[in-house]
A protein has these predicted regions:
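S-adenosylmethionine/decaboxylated-SAM
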Residues: 1-107
Length: 107
């Protein structure tokens, strides 16, 4: 933020994602997202994040799923697969890590 000190670009919100995300979106109409990093591990918070935040991702924006495809955190994958259904985007894996996860670019 030192490049543009008078504008706050980061806001940490403490609380239950299932409550704070809907409230945050309601309080910030017109918000757009260029990078959505989902690192929630389990189903319900991931579903909430997708329901409320994915529609705000700009075309060309990046969506990163930290635990997609991990056996220990199947909820994140399930929420993603259910959200997109037949229109599921192809997850691009990072070549520099042995763990699953990855990203896609919103059309």
């Amino acid at each position: 933020d030192s490049m543009i000190p008078r504008f706050n670009r980061v806001e940490l919100v403490k609380g239950d994602v299932n409550k704070t995300i809907p409230e945050f979106v309601k309080e910030h109409p017109g918000m757009r997202i260029s990078l959505l990093h989902i690192d929630l591990d389990i189903y319900e918070p991931t579903k909430t994040a997708l329901d409320y935040l994915y529609p705000l991702v700009s075309p060309g924006g990046v969506v990163l799923l930290d635990e997609y495809g991990m056996a220990d955190f199947q909820g994140e994958s399930l929420a993603f697969d259910e959200y997109f259904g037949e229109n599921k985007p192809k997850i691009i894996k990072f070549p520099f890590t042995p763990t699953p996860g990855g990203y896609f670019i919103k059309p």
